[in-house]
A protein has these predicted regions:
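Compositionally biased linear targeting/interaction segments
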Residues: 2-4, 8-13, 17-311
């Protein structure tokens, strides 16, 4: 009887020790998770603060009259974030660039009939093997998307297309708020969207194209469409002058038969795109800036949109 009692006591002690070990392990695991979660929260906060370094750099660069905003790579990057400032925020690495959004074609310009032919030529030059009727359909559908609703139009082929999607949806009937809306337009598949993405943008107002920063693909679509010889001549002139000035516009639009309203040599809209990396997390940062100049030449910059990890 005594041996049975000792065995029961031993089993009870082992059971209690097991419970204590399980509880201690659970508490230790919970503590580790809390510490890790706190560390991630603190690092997220530091990442957010580090992005402000890039935003101040971008705004300061845009208001500085000595800053040379010249295209560095195809796509409109006009200024690269200095490597000397990449470690400015402790324990963070920052990189990025400032992009000229008026180096791209603004889809919201399509409300103006004059830009519809420019967009068609951009599509034609980009998708050389595509049927012209398919490209014209995209121009028509995109114009329909960004234009105000017309009750007299009724249900047409475009409306039928949107109704048949799963799930069905309606066009915006207003300027695009994000370039991702273009993927929803009738006739635009993933390949077309991704191919055009570096050349297009959706800005809140109608914007002319900057001759100083636009890519050859965009320049070739201007006016009635530049020939290869005209495009080469224009690019050579741009390289010789480094940057076109306002006084050069009249000569350029006359020689290359480009409507003056379609082009400019100074942009208003820019994109600051950057990446901030910490020990365990990283963050992509996008900020659209609007620069204006008053009569005295003084420039001011305002933030239009600010997003994280997606535009």
């Amino acid at each position: 009887m005594v041996h049975k009692q000792k065995g029961s006591a031993l089993l009870s002690a082992l059971f209690l020790m097991t419970l204590v070990a399980i509880a201690a392990t659970a508490m230790s695991t919970r503590l580790q998770l809390d510490i890790y979660r706190t560390r991630l929260t603190l690092e997220s906060g530091r990442l957010m603060l580090a992005t402000q370094v890039m935003s101040f750099w971008a705004m300061d660069s845009l208001v500085n009259p000595n800053t040379k905003l010249k295209q560095k790579v195809d796509g409109g990057a006009v200024l690269v974030y200095p490597e000397s400032m990449s470690k400015l925020y402790p324990e963070m690495t920052m990189s990025g660039a400032l992009y000229d959004l008026q180096a791209r074609f603004n889809l919201n310009n399509l409300q103006d009939v004059g830009y519809q032919s420019v967009f068609f030529k951009l599509l034609k030059n980009t998708f050389k093997k595509a049927e012209l009727k398919d490209l014209q359909y995209i121009v028509t559908a995109t114009t329909h998307w960004v234009s105000p609703y017309q009750p007299a139009r009724g249900v047409d082929d475009l409306m039928t297309y949107y109704y048949e999607q799963k799930p069905p949806y309606l066009p915006a009937y207003q300027p695009m708020q994000s370039i991702t809306e273009f993927r929803l337009v009738a006739g635009v598949n993933a390949e077309i969207f991704l191919t055009l993405l570096p050349q297009i943008v959706a800005l809140p107002t109608s914007t002319p194209i900057n001759l100083n920063t636009a890519s050859p693909t965009i320049l070739k679509a201007l006016g009635n469409g530049l020939t290869d010889a005209q495009l080469t001549e224009l690019l050579q002139l741009r390289d010789q002058k480094e940057t076109f000035k306002a006084s050069d516009i009249l000569l350029l639009v006359t020689n290359f038969h480009i409507p003056a309203a379609q082009v400019t040599v100074e942009s208003e809209y820019y994109l600051c795109a950057g990446k901030v990396s910490g020990k365990e997390l990283s963050l992509n940062y996008y900020m659209v800036l609007h620069r204006t100049k008053d009569r005295t030449g003084a420039m001011t910059v305002q933030v239009v949109t600010e997003t994280l990890n997606s535009m």
